[in-house]
């Protein structure tokens, strides 16, 4: 999600004390704001039903929402509607300690937004990897891989995310090479230095953060916890695609990744061909 948050203007309503039902290695979480699916969203949820196996699935939605589609196979969890009022509220929610506390009974959550595809049932091997966060890789303008990336289809270790958000201090000694490259642009460095000057831990940085939530997890979260580990861009070409899906498949040895995000926006012709071939 390439969107921006206006600090202090997002009226989140923390859902403390709430818990997602059940527990285990993985919960697939689909945030949803409308009770009606578009045709493309219906395709995406059908791939989740087809390849999601027996992994538990949850629709996370505003309180009072009525579903006009079949929700068989999904548990539901209603939150205050303020937490879904626009992309800014969503980004802020995804950087909130109370959000990950909802899933404390699970080792991982797989965020599967309604514009995602699940292309394989091989989810379990990714749960065995040591990483805290996996998302579709970002590319540089010249087509080179940049970093692990987008949060729309992302695997997250719940305990590691909670450790970051509860951290009281950051350490510059944890800066990785990809993080350092971003800091050289200036904007990220100003955020970091400004935060370190004020203190306040991860909660303080999040309160002033005006970028998309996945950028927080990629470029800042590792500074707050030694346990928060990220894969390289090369290591996630098998996990997901967003932009440049053909290039992702090429880099993955000609194989489709586990999933995709924003598939209708990036090379739709490729995905139409791919979905048709999977249906045969």
Protein language model regions, located:
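Catalytic core and acceptor-binding pocket of nucleotide-sugar-dependent glycosyltransferases
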Residues: 153-280
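Short, hydrophobic beta-strand segments that form beta-sheet elements in well-ordered domains
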Residues: 54-62, 134-136
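Short glycine-/acidic-enriched loop or helix-start segments at secondary-structure transitions
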Residues: 69-70, 120-123, 165
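Short, acidic, metal-binding catalytic loop of nucleotide-sugar glycosyltransferases
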Residues: 43-55
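Short beta-strand-to-loop acidic/aromatic patch adjacent to the donor-nucleotide binding site
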Residues: 106-117
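Active-site-proximal specificity loops/subdomain of glycosyltransferases
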Residues: 60-107
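Conserved donor-nucleotide/metal-binding helix-loop-beta segment in metal-dependent transferases, i.e.
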Residues: 117-148
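N-proximal low-complexity "stem/linker" segments adjacent to membrane-targeting elements
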Residues: 1-46
């Amino acid at each position: 999600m390439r969107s921006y948050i206006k600090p202090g203007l997002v009226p989140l309503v923390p859902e403390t004390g709430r818990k997602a039902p059940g527990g285990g290695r993985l919960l697939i979480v689909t945030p949803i704001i409308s009770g009606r699916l578009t045709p493309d969203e219906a395709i995406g949820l059908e791939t989740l039903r087809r390849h999601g196996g027996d992994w538990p699935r949850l629709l996370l939605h505003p309180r009072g929402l009525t579903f006009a589609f079949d929700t068989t196979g999904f548990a539901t969890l209603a939150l205050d509607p303020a937490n879904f009022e626009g992309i800014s509220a969503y980004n802020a929610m995804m950087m909130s300690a109370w959000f990950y506390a909802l899933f404390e009974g699970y080792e991982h959550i797989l965020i599967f937004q309604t514009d995602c595809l699940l292309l394989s049932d091989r989810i379990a091997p990714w749960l065995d990897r040591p990483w805290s966060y996996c998302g579709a890789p970002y590319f540089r303008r010249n087509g080179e891989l940049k970093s692990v990336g987008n949060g729309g289809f992302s695997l997250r270790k719940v305990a590691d995310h909670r450790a970051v958000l509860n951290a009281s201090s950051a350490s510059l000694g944890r800066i990785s090479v990809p993080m350092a490259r971003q800091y050289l642009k200036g904007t990220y460095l100003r955020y970091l230095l400004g935060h370190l000057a004020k203190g306040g831990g991860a909660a303080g940085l999040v309160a002033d953060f005006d970028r998309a939530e996945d950028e927080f997890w990629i470029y800042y979260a590792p500074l707050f916890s030694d346990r928060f580990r990220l894969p390289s861009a090369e290591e996630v070409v098998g996990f997901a695609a967003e932009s440049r899906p053909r290039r992702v498949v090429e880099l993955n040895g000609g194989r489709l990744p586990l999933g995709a995000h924003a598939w209708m926006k990036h090379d739709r012709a490729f995905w139409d061909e791919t979905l048709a071939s999977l249906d045969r």
